[in-house]
Amino acid sequence: MIELGVNIDHVATLRQARRTYEPDPVWAAVEAHLGGADGITVHLREDRRHIQDHDVRRLRELVHIKLNLEMAATDEMVEIACALKPEMAMLVPEGREEITTESGLDVAGKEARLKSVVAKLADAGIMSSVFIDALPEQVDAAARIGAKVCEIHTGPYAHAFHAKGRDRESAAVVAEIAKIRDAGAAVRALGMRFNAGHALNYFNVQPVASLPGVGELHIGHAIVSRSLFVGLREAVRQMKALIREAAVPFD
Protein backbone atom coordinates (compact mmCIF):
# COMPACT_ATOMS: atom_id res chain seq x y z
CA MET A 1 0.00 0.00 0.00
CA ILE A 2 1.23 3.48 -0.83
CA GLU A 3 2.32 5.49 2.20
CA LEU A 4 1.41 9.12 2.79
CA GLY A 5 3.96 11.53 4.17
CA VAL A 6 2.30 14.74 5.34
CA ASN A 7 4.34 17.92 5.02
CA ILE A 8 3.53 20.29 7.87
CA ASP A 9 5.73 23.22 6.82
CA HIS A 10 2.75 25.51 6.30
CA VAL A 11 1.53 25.04 9.83
CA ALA A 12 4.81 26.69 10.77
CA THR A 13 4.31 29.28 8.01
CA LEU A 14 1.12 30.42 9.74
CA ARG A 15 2.90 30.58 13.09
CA GLN A 16 5.83 32.55 11.69
CA ALA A 17 3.48 35.10 10.12
CA ARG A 18 3.04 36.45 13.66
CA ARG A 19 6.35 35.21 15.12
CA THR A 20 4.39 33.54 17.87
CA TYR A 21 4.12 30.02 19.31
CA GLU A 22 0.99 28.72 17.62
CA PRO A 23 -0.10 26.74 15.71
CA ASP A 24 2.36 24.14 16.94
CA PRO A 25 3.81 21.89 14.20
CA VAL A 26 4.26 19.09 16.73
CA TRP A 27 0.54 19.09 17.49
CA ALA A 28 -0.07 19.10 13.74
CA ALA A 29 2.15 16.03 13.38
CA VAL A 30 0.17 14.22 16.07
CA GLU A 31 -3.13 15.08 14.37
CA ALA A 32 -1.78 13.95 11.00
CA HIS A 33 -0.65 10.67 12.53
CA LEU A 34 -4.09 10.12 14.06
CA GLY A 35 -5.61 10.79 10.64
CA GLY A 36 -3.55 8.01 9.11
CA ALA A 37 -0.31 9.66 8.01
CA ASP A 38 2.54 7.18 7.64
CA GLY A 39 5.20 9.83 8.03
CA ILE A 40 5.84 13.51 8.64
CA THR A 41 7.88 15.69 6.30
CA VAL A 42 9.45 19.02 7.24
CA HIS A 43 11.82 21.24 5.30
CA LEU A 44 14.38 22.98 7.50
CA ARG A 45 15.38 25.72 5.10
CA GLU A 46 18.60 27.66 5.39
CA ASP A 47 16.59 30.88 5.82
CA ARG A 48 14.34 29.26 8.48
CA ARG A 49 11.26 30.84 6.91
CA HIS A 50 8.87 28.33 8.48
CA ILE A 51 10.20 25.24 10.30
CA GLN A 52 12.73 26.10 13.01
CA ASP A 53 15.51 24.05 14.58
CA HIS A 54 13.52 23.53 17.77
CA ASP A 55 10.62 22.17 15.72
CA VAL A 56 12.65 19.32 14.26
CA ARG A 57 14.16 18.50 17.65
CA ARG A 58 10.73 18.34 19.28
CA LEU A 59 9.30 16.30 16.41
CA ARG A 60 12.09 13.78 16.80
CA GLU A 61 11.61 13.59 20.56
CA LEU A 62 7.82 13.66 20.87
CA VAL A 63 6.23 12.23 17.72
CA HIS A 64 6.54 8.49 17.20
CA ILE A 65 6.21 8.39 13.44
CA LYS A 66 8.65 8.26 10.53
CA LEU A 67 10.35 11.62 9.99
CA ASN A 68 11.52 12.82 6.57
CA LEU A 69 13.80 15.86 6.74
CA GLU A 70 13.98 17.90 3.55
CA MET A 71 17.28 19.75 3.39
CA ALA A 72 19.82 21.44 1.19
CA ALA A 73 23.10 19.58 0.77
CA THR A 74 25.07 22.02 2.93
CA ASP A 75 27.54 21.24 5.70
CA GLU A 76 25.24 22.86 8.26
CA MET A 77 22.24 20.76 7.26
CA VAL A 78 24.24 17.55 7.09
CA GLU A 79 25.47 18.19 10.63
CA ILE A 80 21.92 18.83 11.85
CA ALA A 81 20.60 15.71 10.12
CA CYS A 82 23.35 13.50 11.53
CA ALA A 83 22.56 14.72 15.04
CA LEU A 84 18.79 14.46 14.57
CA LYS A 85 18.81 11.07 12.81
CA PRO A 86 15.52 11.22 10.90
CA GLU A 87 14.49 8.03 9.16
CA MET A 88 15.03 9.75 5.82
CA ALA A 89 16.78 12.89 4.61
CA MET A 90 15.64 14.24 1.25
CA LEU A 91 18.10 16.45 -0.58
CA VAL A 92 16.39 19.32 -2.37
CA PRO A 93 17.48 22.48 -4.18
CA GLU A 94 16.94 25.80 -2.43
CA GLY A 95 16.62 29.35 -3.70
CA ARG A 96 16.35 32.32 -1.40
CA GLU A 97 13.74 34.06 -3.56
CA GLU A 98 11.54 31.05 -4.30
CA ILE A 99 8.15 30.64 -2.63
CA THR A 100 8.50 26.87 -2.65
CA THR A 101 10.83 24.34 -4.26
CA GLU A 102 10.53 25.05 -7.97
CA SER A 103 12.47 22.23 -9.64
CA GLY A 104 14.28 19.03 -8.93
CA LEU A 105 17.82 18.77 -7.64
CA ASP A 106 20.49 18.70 -10.35
CA VAL A 107 22.13 15.49 -9.16
CA ALA A 108 23.91 14.95 -12.48
CA GLY A 109 25.62 18.33 -12.17
CA LYS A 110 26.69 17.90 -8.54
CA GLU A 111 27.58 14.23 -8.28
CA ALA A 112 30.83 14.52 -6.33
CA ARG A 113 29.36 16.75 -3.62
CA LEU A 114 26.14 14.80 -3.32
CA LYS A 115 27.91 11.44 -3.19
CA SER A 116 29.88 12.72 -0.19
CA VAL A 117 26.70 13.96 1.52
CA VAL A 118 24.90 10.66 0.94
CA ALA A 119 27.87 8.77 2.39
CA LYS A 120 27.90 10.93 5.53
CA LEU A 121 24.18 10.43 6.02
CA ALA A 122 24.54 6.68 5.52
CA ASP A 123 27.30 6.57 8.14
CA ALA A 124 24.79 8.16 10.56
CA GLY A 125 22.20 5.50 9.71
CA ILE A 126 20.03 7.84 7.65
CA MET A 127 18.39 6.81 4.38
CA SER A 128 19.04 9.34 1.62
CA SER A 129 16.44 10.51 -0.86
CA VAL A 130 16.80 12.96 -3.72
CA PHE A 131 14.05 15.16 -5.15
CA ILE A 132 14.52 15.08 -8.92
CA ASP A 133 12.79 15.94 -12.15
CA ALA A 134 11.51 13.02 -14.23
CA LEU A 135 14.64 12.88 -16.39
CA PRO A 136 16.68 9.73 -17.18
CA GLU A 137 20.01 11.45 -16.56
CA GLN A 138 18.91 12.50 -13.07
CA VAL A 139 17.68 9.02 -12.19
CA ASP A 140 20.97 7.50 -13.34
CA ALA A 141 22.97 10.06 -11.37
CA ALA A 142 20.90 9.37 -8.24
CA ALA A 143 21.87 5.71 -8.45
CA ARG A 144 25.55 6.59 -8.91
CA ILE A 145 25.68 8.74 -5.77
CA GLY A 146 24.14 5.96 -3.69
CA ALA A 147 20.69 7.41 -3.04
CA LYS A 148 18.20 4.84 -1.79
CA VAL A 149 15.09 6.80 -2.76
CA CYS A 150 14.12 9.09 -5.64
CA GLU A 151 11.16 11.40 -5.19
CA ILE A 152 9.95 12.34 -8.65
CA HIS A 153 8.87 15.97 -8.97
CA THR A 154 5.15 16.02 -9.82
CA GLY A 155 4.90 19.80 -10.17
CA PRO A 156 4.86 19.89 -14.00
CA TYR A 157 2.07 17.31 -14.00
CA ALA A 158 0.07 19.24 -11.39
CA HIS A 159 0.44 22.47 -13.33
CA ALA A 160 -0.69 20.80 -16.56
CA PHE A 161 -3.64 19.23 -14.74
CA HIS A 162 -4.77 22.64 -13.48
CA ALA A 163 -4.13 24.41 -16.80
CA LYS A 164 -6.24 21.84 -18.66
CA GLY A 165 -9.22 22.23 -16.36
CA ARG A 166 -8.54 19.00 -14.44
CA ASP A 167 -8.96 16.97 -17.62
CA ARG A 168 -7.09 13.72 -16.98
CA GLU A 169 -7.36 12.76 -20.65
CA SER A 170 -5.79 15.91 -22.09
CA ALA A 171 -2.61 15.31 -24.08
CA ALA A 172 -0.53 17.52 -21.80
CA VAL A 173 -1.64 15.71 -18.65
CA VAL A 174 -1.18 12.27 -20.19
CA ALA A 175 2.32 13.25 -21.33
CA GLU A 176 3.35 14.43 -17.85
CA ILE A 177 1.99 11.29 -16.20
CA ALA A 178 3.94 9.20 -18.71
CA LYS A 179 7.15 11.00 -17.73
CA ILE A 180 6.56 10.24 -14.05
CA ARG A 181 5.67 6.62 -14.83
CA ASP A 182 8.78 6.09 -16.94
CA ALA A 183 11.04 7.77 -14.39
CA GLY A 184 9.54 5.63 -11.64
CA ALA A 185 10.16 2.47 -13.63
CA ALA A 186 13.79 3.50 -14.14
CA VAL A 187 14.17 4.26 -10.44
CA ARG A 188 12.93 0.81 -9.49
CA ALA A 189 15.02 -0.90 -12.17
CA LEU A 190 18.11 0.63 -10.55
CA GLY A 191 17.12 -0.71 -7.14
CA MET A 192 15.86 2.51 -5.59
CA ARG A 193 12.50 3.34 -4.04
CA PHE A 194 10.09 5.37 -6.16
CA ASN A 195 8.36 8.20 -4.29
CA ALA A 196 6.54 11.19 -5.74
CA GLY A 197 5.41 14.61 -4.64
CA HIS A 198 4.98 18.35 -5.13
CA ALA A 199 1.76 20.26 -5.80
CA LEU A 200 -0.40 17.16 -5.40
CA ASN A 201 -3.91 17.80 -4.13
CA TYR A 202 -7.33 16.17 -3.73
CA PHE A 203 -8.14 16.57 -7.42
CA ASN A 204 -4.91 15.42 -9.07
CA VAL A 205 -3.51 12.81 -6.70
CA GLN A 206 -5.22 9.70 -8.05
CA PRO A 207 -3.50 9.43 -11.44
CA VAL A 208 -0.15 9.52 -9.62
CA ALA A 209 -1.30 7.11 -6.91
CA SER A 210 -2.35 4.66 -9.61
CA LEU A 211 1.13 4.43 -11.13
CA PRO A 212 2.88 1.07 -10.70
CA GLY A 213 5.50 0.96 -8.01
CA VAL A 214 4.89 4.23 -6.19
CA GLY A 215 5.98 3.72 -2.60
CA GLU A 216 5.12 7.01 -0.94
CA LEU A 217 3.51 10.35 -1.75
CA HIS A 218 4.49 13.53 0.06
CA ILE A 219 1.72 16.11 0.26
CA GLY A 220 1.50 19.24 2.37
CA HIS A 221 -0.10 22.47 1.19
CA ALA A 222 -3.33 20.88 -0.02
CA ILE A 223 -3.84 18.98 3.22
CA VAL A 224 -3.06 21.97 5.43
CA SER A 225 -5.39 24.12 3.31
CA ARG A 226 -8.29 21.69 3.64
CA SER A 227 -7.64 21.34 7.35
CA LEU A 228 -8.79 24.94 7.85
CA PHE A 229 -12.31 23.74 7.04
CA VAL A 230 -12.46 20.11 8.17
CA GLY A 231 -9.59 19.78 10.65
CA LEU A 232 -6.18 18.25 10.01
CA ARG A 233 -7.09 14.74 11.10
CA GLU A 234 -10.04 14.60 8.70
CA ALA A 235 -8.06 16.23 5.89
CA VAL A 236 -5.46 13.47 6.15
CA ARG A 237 -8.16 10.79 6.27
CA GLN A 238 -9.70 12.14 3.07
CA MET A 239 -6.36 12.12 1.26
CA LYS A 240 -5.58 8.61 2.45
CA ALA A 241 -8.96 7.44 1.16
CA LEU A 242 -8.27 8.86 -2.30
CA ILE A 243 -4.85 7.24 -2.42
CA ARG A 244 -6.20 3.91 -1.23
CA GLU A 245 -8.96 4.02 -3.85
CA ALA A 246 -6.52 4.68 -6.69
CA ALA A 247 -3.53 2.60 -5.65
CA VAL A 248 -2.61 -0.55 -7.53
CA PRO A 249 -0.66 -3.37 -5.85
CA PHE A 250 2.94 -3.89 -6.88
CA ASP A 251 5.70 -6.34 -6.04
Positions of PLM-derived features:
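Glycine-rich, proline-tolerant flexible connector loops at the mouths of alpha/beta enzymes
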Residues: 16, 38-63, 93-106, 154-170, ...
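Catalytic cores of alpha/beta
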Residues: 75-84, 135-145, 196, 200-214
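C-terminal helical cap(s) of enzyme catalytic domains, especially alpha/beta-barrels
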Residues: 60, 162-173, 226-248
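Conserved, mostly hydrophobic/aromatic
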Residues: 6, 32, 43, 81, ...
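Short beta-strand/loop segments at the ligand-binding rim of alpha/beta enzyme cores
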Residues: 1-4, 61-69, 117-130, 183-196
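Hydrophobic faces of well-ordered beta-strands that scaffold small-molecule active sites
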Residues: 2-8, 40-42, 67-71, 89-91, ...
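Histidine/lysine/aspartate-rich catalytic loop segments that bind and position anionic ligands
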Residues: 127-186
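Conserved N-terminal beta1-alpha1 strand-loop-helix module at the mouth
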Residues: 1-75, 82-86, 172
